[in-house]
Amino acid sequence: MNISFSKSAIDDLKSIKEHYLAQGLPQIGQDFIVAIIEHIETLAAHPSIGRVVPEFNDDSIRELIHSPFRVVYLRESESINIIRV
């Protein structure tokens, strides 16, 4: 299954990295980004692993929790679109 990232999701990942860089913790920021992306990659084999986002109550809009972050994605028949992090 193909996984794509919206511009908003890419911007979110950049913001996470910049936040930790500004705190003087660039390696922690980089480690978080790598771990989040690895978690997202599990969706290719298990697209329904995330729970339905309560605010939307739509089975196709799901979330993975990667504490303290939430990855919101759209599950479609042939692809997954990462909406926000």
Model-based region annotation:
Residues 2-60:
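Basic, Lys/Arg-enriched alpha-helical interface segments
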Residues 66-70, 74-85:
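Enriched for short, Lys/Arg-rich terminal
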